[in-house]
């Protein structure tokens, strides 16, 4: 499945370059309107990131997420600033399908396992962000020495299934996904569902990832640059 992304900052839809909060491009001043366009196109899935929340460590753009949920009927997932159970309960309680736990999975694995046990692996997604195979946290501002493989292995033991793996060095660059990293992780953890994020350009990239067993991808800049279209995403998702 392909998830088009909407990144929220200051109430607008933006794109960052390599996760740098200072290097933003405003995509749409009205993210809800953008979500309605995705709904009309029948893309079937949407990946939301609360960038303000990622920085603040708590949900910030809650009203926008609620309005997006009302406008969009497909699978909706949200990440950014979800660091405690109250935030998980908040989003799942308003009808969001999946929440993405990134920093908290690294820093509070017991809480992460607790919410997986309560809500199930279909609703709790682990965000594994980083570079050089090591995990980054706190909106990518904090680079750790923890290997991605350690975090994924521990979370699988805790019941997790979905892992959105973002290579920070590729995000927003249009250089192609880090296929070696993603393919190797999928091979090492065959029960996991590795989701590609960062650098995905077009359907060729997505099919190349598929060949390595990586069946889900998130696209952001590629959609705005026109190298992949809403129509292509909708058609792909309806067939898969």
Predicted segment positions?
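Active-site-adjacent beta->alpha loops and helix N-cap segments on the catalytic face
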Residues: 2, 53-69, 83-89, 103-125, ...
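Short secondary-structure boundary segments
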Residues: 6, 50, 103-104, 128-130, ...
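Conserved, mostly hydrophobic/aromatic
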Residues: 7, 38, 46, 91, ...
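Conserved anion-binding
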Residues: 11-14, 18-22, 92, 96-171
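N-terminal beta-alpha supersecondary unit
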Residues: 13-59
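Active-site-adjacent loop and "lid" segments of alpha/beta metabolic enzymes
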Residues: 17, 132-144, 173-176, 184, ...
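Short, acidic/polar
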Residues: 27-39, 83-89, 144-154, 206
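Catalytic cores of alpha/beta
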Residues: 72, 76-98, 180-216
